[in-house]
């Protein structure tokens, strides 16, 4: 069954009430970096238990963790990677004990999602984020370049260690695509950037715990037929980011959920057709009048529009 969730920080805020008032009671959470006690790490059992209970006290069930312990050494194959991998194994073991079924991770070395503008004007004076490869610095990062094949080798090493732990604890590893799906960036290869590469990931270690986060804003930059891509991955999809963009991998802007390049209704039908059983959350919403752009893409009021739009599509497809 497809259910709507929201990404909510573990510290209570007005967004908690807004989400509940919009009918959302499933939380996608981070890790409790800001609330650990002396001697604790955020991926250990007690901090995670307290975080889960805090969500529950606010009326939410924690269903996905979408944050990572430090992983750059693992991605680059540097000394210390085994220690980083061990922290991931600890996280997965504790997620299993607490009944948190999905861990969303990514394989972007050195930097995460990249934008060159976080206040591009959009509909009615709202603001969205955008990307233009020509506005990026050209020099390599301080760690230097790394090839795509090196990243594949390091990912396989990582999965060899981590996937058995995920399987033993019934936690799905859910790979998020590169954002943007473009390679290289500043000399750093990016491998989770195409439909074929995601097929390679799934085939590398076939397992119902080796899965895909279908982030629509990235996947729609990889294909002009996103509903077909959804159907092709089928049961390998464990988590969905529902958003849209306009443009190409080298130059794009994010959009309101009803104003991008993608047929969002057709996507919702595709999730129904594959029998998607998991959570979908709105992602990267516009900043609207009366809200802060300090955390661009995560405007509280913009999320309310997205939740309502998604709920309407869901009702039309699943009950229409």
Regions found by a protein language model. Name each.
Residues 30-156, 167-168, 218:
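Structural motif corresponding to the early beta-alpha repeats
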Residues 136-151, 177-187, 291-293:
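Active-site-proximal beta-alpha loop/turn segments in soluble metabolic enzymes
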Residues 27, 176, 215:
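Active-site glycine-centered loops adjacent to acidic/histidine catalytic or metal-binding residues
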Residues 1-5, 10, 16-23, 56, ...:
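Histidine-acidic metal/acid-base catalytic patches
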Residues 18-35:
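Basic, amphipathic N-terminal segments that precede the first structured/catalytic domain
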């Amino acid at each position: 069954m497809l259910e709507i969730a929201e990404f909510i920080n573990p510290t209570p805020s007005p967004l908690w009430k807004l989400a509940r008032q919009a009918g959302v009671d499933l939380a996608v959470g981070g890790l409790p970096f800001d609330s650990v006690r002396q001697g604790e790490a955020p991926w250990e059992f007690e901090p995670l238990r307290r975080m889960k209970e805090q969500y529950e006290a606010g009326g939410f069930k924690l269903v996905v963790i979408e944050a990572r312990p430090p992983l750059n050494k693992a991605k680059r194959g540097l000394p210390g990677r085994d220690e980083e991998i061990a922290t991931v194994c600890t996280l997965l073991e504790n997620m299993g004990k607490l009944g948190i079924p999905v861990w969303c991770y990514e394989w972007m070395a050195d930097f995460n999602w990249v934008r060159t503008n976080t206040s591009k004007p959009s509909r009615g004076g709202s603001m969205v984020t955008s990307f233009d490869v020509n506005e990026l610095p050209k020099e390599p990062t301080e760690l230097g370049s790394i090839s795509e094949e090196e990243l594949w080798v390091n990912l396989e090493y990582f999965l060899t260690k981590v996937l058995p732990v995920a399987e033993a604890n019934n936690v799905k590893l859910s790979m998020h695509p590169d954002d943007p799906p473009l390679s290289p960036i500043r000399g750093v290869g990016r491998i989770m950037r195409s439909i074929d590469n995601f097929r390679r990931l799934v085939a590398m270690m076939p397992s119902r715990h080796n899965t895909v986060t279908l982030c629509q804003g990235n996947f729609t930059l990889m294909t002009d037929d996103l509903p077909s891509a959804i159907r092709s991955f089928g049961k390998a999809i464990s988590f969905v980011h529902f958003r849209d963009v306009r443009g190409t991998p080298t130059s794009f802007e994010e959009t309101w959920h009803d104003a991008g390049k993608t047929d969002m209704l057709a996507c919702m039908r595709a999730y129904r057709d594959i029998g998607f059983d998991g959570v979908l959350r709105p992602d990267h919403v516009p900043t609207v009048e009366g809200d802060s752009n300090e955390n661009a893409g995560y405007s509280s009021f913009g999320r309310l529009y997205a939740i309502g739009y998604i709920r309407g599509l869901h009702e039309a497809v699943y009950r229409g």
